[in-house]
Curated annotation (Swiss-Prot):
Pfam families: GAD (PF02938), tRNA-synt_2 (PF00152), tRNA_anti-codon (PF01336). PROSITE patterns: AA_TRNA_LIGASE_II. Keywords: Aminoacyl-tRNA synthetase, ATP-binding, Ligase, Membrane, Mitochondrion, Nucleotide-binding, Phosphoprotein, Protein biosynthesis, Transit peptide. Its EC number is 6.1.1.12. ATP binds at R265, D266, E267, E534, G583, L584, D585, R586. It catalyses: tRNA(Asp) + L-aspartate + ATP = L-aspartyl-tRNA(Asp) + AMP + diphosphate. InterPro entries: Aa-tRNA-synt_II, aa-tRNA-synth_II, aa-tRNA-synth_II/BPL/LPL, Asp-tRNA-ligase_1, Asp-tRNA-ligase_1_N, Asp/Asn-tRNA-synth_IIb, AspRS_core, GAD-like_sf. One of its GO terms (cellular component) is mitochondrial matrix. Transmembrane segments: none annotated. This is Aspartate--tRNA ligase, mitochondrial. Residues 243-246 are annotated as: Aspartate. Residues 1-46 form a transit peptide.
Length: 652
């Protein structure tokens, strides 16, 4: 009987009209097309149910409904709560003998079993309504029930308040996905991507184009994953971004490109990164930096969740030099102050030795931050941690100065600070009672970077003491501009490397410096920062083949043969173009307030890059490797061999 009724319902669902579709003329596409966000979705079409568990209300009283879902919990064999991805509803289990089979099915099915229940929507008895549930005014009086799949004992309960280790969650990811938080995160992600696609493609004429996943190794950037081919010694690589392809699409006249792109970077064990990730990839012809910024601001405003405060555009901006000097980083969190102040002039005639030594050197400076109420809330062990952090990570000394409630200065160096220096320092730093000043000295960039780190450490410490510095409901966007085009290599300071990638165009006002002082050239690169996190980066590209060849070959010492296809394309009439990539995982993580990007990805890797559910990466037998002309040799060192846990299929 259940199969027959199910087929009848399915037939009705298939015959139901999906909705009228318009056939607009191409020229008026953006004016005529009905956006999908304006339609009411039908969640029960084409399936064996009439409604979802979360949609029933008092307006449905008396209706006969069929629901499908998981048994959330059962109480005294009288009620059970049925759950699907749309919500919860209470099922009243019949107690009369005529419905014994229904009662047996619903009472004997283990929790998390999948059932289909048909019945009548009735009002809950007066006083038994549950205001915490959207369906709390009604319940379903069950008439028929079918066990679709019984559930075995679970490794953990599917309840948000049940604490589970991340390793266990990743091992049983398909169970973790049933939680309301994961459901919310993934559905919000889907909605944001849908709105982004509408904004770009429907409203602004972008073309959604897939680019290849199998490519070749290219110079610069992050390490790439290699994919063997059947030709001896020849490998593909998984692209770290569609950078070259989207530039070639501009050469091909596509004008406006967009893609929800999968990208791959072999960066090893990093807790905040994934070896595979998703970015909203954008490229435009005949655009400048301002045009890209306006596009992205409109894109985020359009796709922003409705339950959040609307974004205010344009976003503020600052140069890389300003960000470093003020916040000590190129991705500042501007939700709170504690800005870096240059106090070199205050201590020009100081008797404090390490300040004297720093100011005597070229580009030597004295910098400080004021930690409001730091003297009141930070403890002795906190200050010791700060000083050790500075010494270990930056090989620099930090001088703490406290102003207590009686306006007395407390510091190991207090006796060496003159009254004039105190007054000027108080004025510049706007020091108040119970504040703490952290002071350091050295080369400008190093001193700023140290204080930028300490600024965040102090914010963390103060928030653990109960001070609210960073409002989680506030979304503070910032454009950072005018990055250096090149950086000195760490391993060889006399050589240059690209600060971002070698295709970034130099600032028009600095092109002449390419041939004399390339280290001073600014690039037309821009980063989008949200609450101290880089969520996007892009640039105006080099569209002149001669300039691109000069930068690759002469300045970066790269083998231009690896990029001959791109250089040739630029020679064939490449338009001026630029673009940006937004990190979708990071953006959704910040919007949802998730603790990790792994909480907004359906099937993420662990921080070591492993899939704990399937145990990937896995070993491969010699027979499977033979067509690729690959032989695995294990390390000879016994400890390395033990840590590698070799498979029985692979021998040295």
């Amino acid at each position: 009987m259940y199969l027959g009724s199910w087929l009848n319902r399915l037939g009705r669902g298939l015959s139901r009209p999906i909705g009228k579709t318009k056939q607009p003329i191409w020229g008026s596409l953006s004016r005529s097309l009905t956006l999908s966000s304006q339609r009411v979705p039908e969640f029960s079409s084409f399936v064996a149910r009439t409604n979802t568990c979360g949609e029933l209300r008092s307006s449905h009283l008396g209706q006969e409904v069929t629901l499908c879902g998981w048994i959330q919990y059962r109480r005294q064999n009288t009620f059970l709560v049925l759950r699907d991805c749309h919500g919860l509803v209470q099922i009243l289990i019949p107690q009369d003998e005529s419905a014994a089979s229904v009662r047996r099915t619903l009472c004997e099915a283990p929790v998390e079993s999948v059932v289909r229940v048909s019945g009548t929507v009735i009002a809950r008895p007066l006083g038994q309504e549950n205001p915490k549930m959207p369906t709390g005014e009604i319940e379903i009086k069950a008439k028929t029930a079918e066990l679709l799949n019984a559930c075995k004992k679970l490794p953990f309960e599917i309840k948000d308040f049940v604490k589970k280790t991340e390793a266990l969650r990743l091992q049983y990811r398909y169970l973790d996905l049933r939680s309301s938080q994961m459901q919310h995160n993934l559905r919000l992600r889907s909605q944001m991507v849908m709105k982004m696609r509408e904004y770009l493609c429907t409203l602004h004429g972008f073309v959604d184009i897939e680019t290849p996943t199998l490519f070749k190794r290219t110079p610069g950037g992050a390490k790439e994953f290699l994919v063997p081919s059947r030709e001896p010694g020849r490998f593909y690589s998984l692209p770290q971004s569609p950078q070259q392809f989207k530039q070639l699409l501009m050469v091909g006249g596509l004008d406006r490109y967009f893609q929800v792109a999968r990208c791959y970077r072999d960066e090893g064990s990093r807790p905040d990164r994934q070896p595979e990730f998703t970015q909203i990839d954008i490229e435009m012809s005949f655009v400048d930096q301002t045009g890209i910024q306006h596009l992205v601001e409109g894109l985020l405003h359009y796709s922003w969740p409705e339950d959040k405060d609307p974004l205010v555009a344009p976003f503020p901006s600052m140069t890389f030099a300003e960000a470093l000097a003020t916040y000590g980083t190129d991705k500042p969190d501007t939700r709170f102050g504690m800005k870096i102040v240059d106090i070199s002039d205050v201590f020009r005639n100081t008797e404090i030795r390490f300040l004297q030594d720093a100011l005597a050197k070229p580009q030597g400076t004295v910098k400080a931050i004021c930690v409001h109420e730091g003297a009141k809330y930070l403890r002795k062990e906190d200050i010791e941690f700060i000083r050790k952090f500075a010494a270990h990570h930056f090989s620099q000394e930090v001088l703490p100065i406290f102003l207590n409630a009686r306006k007395n200065w407390s510091s190991p160096f207090a006796k060496f600070i003159t009254e004039e220096e105190r007054l000027e320092l108080t004025r510049l730093m706007e020091i108040q009672e119970d504040d703490m000043v952290l002071l350091t000295a050295g080369q400008h960039e190093k001193a700023c970077s140290l204080l930028g780190k300490l600024r965040l450490e102090c914010a963390d410490l103060l928030e653990t003491r109960g001070l609210a510095l960073r409002d989680p409901a506030l979304f503070s966007f910032l454009w950072v501009l005018d990055f250096p085009l090149f950086l000195a290599k760490e391993e060889s300071p006399t050589e240059l490397e690209s600060a971002h990638h070698p295709f970034t165009a130099p600032h028009p006002g600095d092109i002449h410096l390419l041939y004399t002082e390339p280290e001073k050239v600014r690039g037309q690169h821009y980063d989008l920062v949200l609450n101290g996190n880089e969520i996007g980066g892009g640039s105006i590209r080099i569209h002149d083949a001669q300039l691109q060849r000069y930068i690759l070959e002469t300045l970066l010492k790269e083998d231009v043969k690896l990029l001959s296809h791109l250089l040739q394309a630029l020679d064939y009439g490449a338009p001026p173009h630029g673009g940006i990539a937004l990190g979708l995982d990071r953006l959704v993580c910040l919007v949802t307030g998730a603790p990790s990007i792994r909480d907004v990805i359906a099937f993420p890797k662990s921080y070591r890059g492993h899939d704990l559910m399937s145990n990937a990466p896995d070993t491969v037998s010699p027979e499977d490797l033979k067509p690729y002309h690959i032989h695995v040799s294990w390390p000879t060192d016994s400890e390395e061999r033990a840590s590698a846990t070799p498979s029985k299929y692979l021998s040295s």
